[in-house]
């Protein structure tokens, strides 16, 4: 069974990640620590994922950053990787290799966990993390502080 691993790449001790009006995901992906990860294992972790899951808001922000990027180290991984968006309002997903999971969260996660290699990376957002935690579905939490 595949592990569900929630990642928090950008975390702040004071709770502030960006000023009001900042495009959050663009800000996150433009951080030097994310543009040039000092740990090759971070890229290996993302590359070896079976699927990358996210909520609608995170999907819209990440897709907006990664589909237009020509030089970000995460772009090739995410653009080619399998992505699943958890949303009951999103009707279409234009980002390649993306499906929408609109059913019961626990059942959708169970389907993703079945099978062989790789793990499932949870990118965000907060509503999805909360649902997954409330349902006790997260196997591991990886936090990076800058």
Language-model segments: residues:
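Portal/gating segments that form or line small-molecule/metal binding sites
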Residues: 1-140, 145-146
């Amino acid at each position: 069974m595949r592990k569900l691993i929630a990642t928090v790449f950008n975390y702040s001790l004071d709770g502030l990640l960006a000023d009001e009006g900042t495009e959050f995901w663009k800000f996150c992906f433009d951080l030097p620590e994310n543009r040039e990860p000092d740990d090759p294992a971070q890229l290996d972790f993302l590359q070896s994922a079976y699927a990358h899951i996210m909520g609608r808001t995170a999907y819209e922000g990440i897709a907006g950053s990664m589909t237009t990027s020509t030089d970000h180290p995460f772009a090739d991984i995410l653009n080619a990787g399998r992505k699943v968006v958890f949303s009951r309002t999103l009707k279409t997903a234009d980002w390649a290799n993306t499906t929408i999971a609109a059913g019961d969260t626990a059942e959708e996660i169970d389907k993703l966990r079945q099978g062989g290699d790789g793990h499932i990376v949870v990118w965000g957002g907060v509503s999805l993390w909360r649902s997954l935690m409330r349902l006790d579905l997260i196997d591991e939490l990886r936090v990076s502080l800058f």
